[in-house]
Amino acid sequence: GLTFAIKDNMDWAGVPTTAACPGYSWVPQQSAKVVHLLIESGAALVGKTNMDQFACGLNGTRSPHGPVPNAFDERYVSGGSSSGSAYVVATGQVDFSLGTDTAGSGRVPAGLNNIVGLKPSKGLISTRGVLPAAQSVDCVSIFARTVPMACRVLNAAMGYDPQDPYSRAIKLQTQAFPPIFKFGIPKQRLFFGDDL
């Protein structure tokens, strides 16, 4: 089976959830819904990852456990707040990992570590058992080294959860690109402040 890690704001039954704040630490009795689904699908959860405390930060340096380095050069930031989740995938420690994305916390570290970061449509993956940052927009994000792997994880992780008030039954659809690509050019190309 595939190996994976989760950001430390997600519950794993019997393992402390700290959100990178030792004073907050508590031990959940059940795993987050998405974690449960992935384990049931045969993936092996191997650990939790460091993060910007309470998912507040986009650089990966705001943790009492220390900063998470960039996977290519430790002189640079990894991006955050799902910094550890991006790092363990980029360095090949796991096949995929889970993070969260409210305002870039999944996409930023994915980009800075040159991996795939998938932020699904809100409600596609349950956030039950995930410590909220801004519950109306929080999403569980997926980190992988390839798009096919991220899609494989998404297929196992998604699904309606009646115990998550933001969960939605969404049917995934694809559409072929049109035969002719069209794009727009604004009539007014000079914007306020451009002449400064």
Regions found by a protein language model. Name each.
Residues G1-T102, F183, G193:
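Gly/Ser-rich catalytic/binding loops embedded in alpha/beta enzyme cores
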Residues F4, D8, V116, V140-A144:
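Short glycine- and hydrophobic/aromatic-rich loop-to-beta-strand nucleating segment
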Residues G60, T102-R128:
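Glycine/threonine-rich beta-strand-loop-alpha-helix active-site module
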Residues K119-L196:
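A short helix-breaking turn/cap at a secondary-structure junction
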Residues P16, L58, A110, G129, ...:
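Short, flexible helix/strand-to-coil boundary loops that buttress conserved ligand/catalytic motifs
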Residues H36, S83, T91-G92, F96, ...:
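Residues on a specific face of well-ordered alpha-helices
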Residues Q29, K33, S83, T100, ...:
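Conserved active-site and cofactor/substrate-binding residues in soluble primary-metabolism enzymes
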